[in-house]
Curated annotation (Swiss-Prot):
Keyword Transcription carried by entry: no
Keywords: Chloroplast, Plastid, Ribonucleoprotein, Ribosomal protein, RNA-binding, rRNA-binding
GO cellular component: chloroplast; mitochondrial small ribosomal subunit
Subcellular location: Plastid, Chloroplast
GO biological process per UniProt: ribosomal small subunit assembly; translation
Descriptive protein name: Small ribosomal subunit protein uS19c
Record PROSITE patterns: RIBOSOMAL_S19
Disulphides: none
Organism the protein comes from: Guizotia abyssinica (Niger)
Protein family according to the UniProt entry: Belongs to the universal ribosomal protein uS19 family.
One GO MF term attached to the UniProt entry: rRNA binding
Length: 92
């Protein structure tokens, strides 16, 4: 179920403060965040945000096509290594 249109998109307050501070200074630096649930809003476009994936922070450059999506969608948490090879010893 999607979020109600009456409510605004969720963005963590500390992340919003960091972005507003960088926009007023007109500087570009990497913003580190653990807030994977935050929605990407238009003022974030052009910034690089390092999103935590459970192990490390992955730097993601925000473009205009990402607006409306969540930050966590761009930092995968699982590393699929493939299925086990057909091992006949395990089937006996």
């Amino acid at each position: 179920m999607t979020r109600s249109l009456k409510k605004n998109p969720f963005v963590a307050n500390n992340l919003l403060k960091k972005i507003n501070k960088l926009n007023t200074k007109e500087e570009k630096e990497i913003i580190i965040t653990w807030s994977r649930a935050s929605t990407i809003i238009p003022i974030m476009v052009g910034h690089t945000i390092a999103i935590h994936n459970g192990k490390e922070h992955l730097p993601i450059y925000i473009t205009d096509r990402m607006v409306g999506h969540k930050l966590g969608e761009f930092a995968p948490t699982l590393n699929f290594r493939g299925h086990a090879k057909s091992d006949n010893r395990s089937r006996r």
